[in-house]
Amino acid sequence: MSFNSLKIGKYVIEKPIVQGGMGVGISWDQLAGNVSKEGGLGVISAVGTGYYKNKEYSKKLVSDRPLSEANFYSPEGFDAIIQSAKAIAGDKPLAANILYAINDYGRVVRDACESGIDIIITGAGLPTNMPEFTEGYPDVALVPIVSSAKALKIICKRWKKRYDRVPDAVVVEGPKSGGHQGFTYEQCKLEENQLENIVGPVVEEAALWGDIPVIAAGGVWDKSDIEDMMSRGARGVQMGTRFIGTYECDAHANLKKVLLDAKKEDIQLMSSPVGYPAQGVRTALTEMVEKREGPAIKCISNCVAPCNRGEEAKVVGFCIADRLSDAYEGNLETGLFFSGTNGYRLNEIITVQELLTKLTEGE
């Protein structure tokens, strides 16, 4: 089957493939700009923008790390990434992924709007007040990520009552995605929570609120997966991990190699200071953390609200900002490498254009 374009708000995405937001520094200007340029929707991760271009946009560093959320989520770094991605994408739409759990969420959303982003995607919590922060930017399309029809219903109810609007699209994410999950450990394993079983109910709920396109995410790997999701009522898919296997992906070569070398059994769920389990690759770091021998936790960047200034990091045994940033810098000893459950299937590095051709025309 050939795929129809995907409409999100006023924006038309020629190929209904959204590249998932991946931070720190995995989906920044090069990856997002090129995905949009080639007809998909490129998504810039807002996480850790203070690390962009060797931390040149961080106004204050402590132990060579951006101090506090003001520098970790650097507005100047974020703006530089967005402008660079726009220069690559031309007049094609571009999105930003901004986690609801971060400190300074509202400010970072405003930063994205002021920098001219077209679409904002938000997961890691229920963004019930998201429209509040985009006031004055009516053209910015808003896309929450949910893991159930119930979550979508709560968001739509709240948005309709408070802001007289509903989401422009919704991403429904199953537990095979990389990074943070919308489920507990136990829930991730349940059959009823697998993507193929949650897409249908979310499509039904979305239809009750108008014409809200549903984008399926979490474990989507190839054209047949996309066709399967479309047959269940999705109008697009979101994919993260597979885009790591592209030349344009902003990730360090070492990060790409970790995935290229990973075996199926290396990819696992782990605890995270964000309060949700996260999916990633077993490495030297995960083994150190299990023995409670991980790197010192200093909470320099104060990145996410649920961590409570390092308290949760001490419970789980690592600082997520520092460890994801180490992965961005290619540190194989102390880096944290997120991946979806299919990450072990990555076996080559190709161009974004080649990948989108494989996804839309088959391999």
What is the meaning of each model-derived region?
Residues 26, 220-221:
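Residue-level detector of alpha-helix initiation sites
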Residues 1-209:
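Active-site entrance/lid segments in N-terminal catalytic domains of soluble metabolic enzymes
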Residues 18, 177-215, 221-363:
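Conserved active-site-proximal phosphate/metal-binding subdomains
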Residues 130, 216-217:
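Short, surface-exposed recognition loops or helix-turn segments adjacent to catalytic cores
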